[in-house]
Amino acid sequence: MYQETQPEEFEELKRAEHLLFVSLKYTKTTDVMKNLIRRLINAYDYAVIKALTRMKEKGRIKDIPLSPLSRAELLRDLTKKDADMIDFLSLYFMFRRVDRAEYTKKEEFRKNVTLTVMDEGEFIEIKIDTLREYFNKTKGFINYIKENFS
C-alpha cells in the first residue's frame, strides 16, 4: 500500500511533539528536555536545507554549505531584510548554544522540572512551558519555509 511520506522537518517535528506531550508528561527529566531541543534543531536544519535548495534552484546561490551552522548563517545573510526570518534563526542559534552548554537540573522528576543554562552571560531557565513556546515557534518556522520557499 502506498503511503505518502512527509518531509524530514515534519517528521522531526512529530518526534519533538511526542517528546513534549508524552515523554515529558511521564518522565519529567532534563535528558528528555535536551532531546526535545535536539529534535527542534534537526527540524530547523531540514527546513534551512529546503530553503537553500529552493534558492539554489532559482540561482541565488551556487552551493549549499555542508555544516548546519554555515547553512543557517548563509540563509540569515540572504534574508537579512526579513525580520521574521531573523527572529526564527536567532532562536535556532540559541537552541544550538543551549544544546552545547553546561546545564544544571532543578526539580527533576517533578512538575516544575527546569533546565538552567548559561547563554551569552545570562542564565536561561527552560521549563516545560518554555519548551511549548519553542515548539510552536519551530512549527511556525517550518510553515514559514513551506509557504515562502516552496
Residue ranges and their predicted role:
Residues 1-5, 52, 92-99:
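Short low-complexity stretches enriched in small and charged residues
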Residues 58-142:
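Long, charged low-complexity segments
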Residues 25-58:
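N-terminal interaction modules that seed assembly of large macromolecular complexes
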Residues 2, 138, 147-150:
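Short hairpin/turn module used for nucleic-acid contact or packing/dimerization
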Residues 12-19, 39, 46, 134-137, ...:
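Amphipathic, well-ordered alpha-helical segments in soluble domains
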Residues 16-27, 50, 54, 145-149:
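Secondary-structure edge/capping motif, primarily at the C-terminal ends of alpha-helices
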Residues 7, 34, 38-41, 129-136:
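A generic "alpha-helical surface" signal
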Residues 1-35:
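Charged alpha-helical initiation segments
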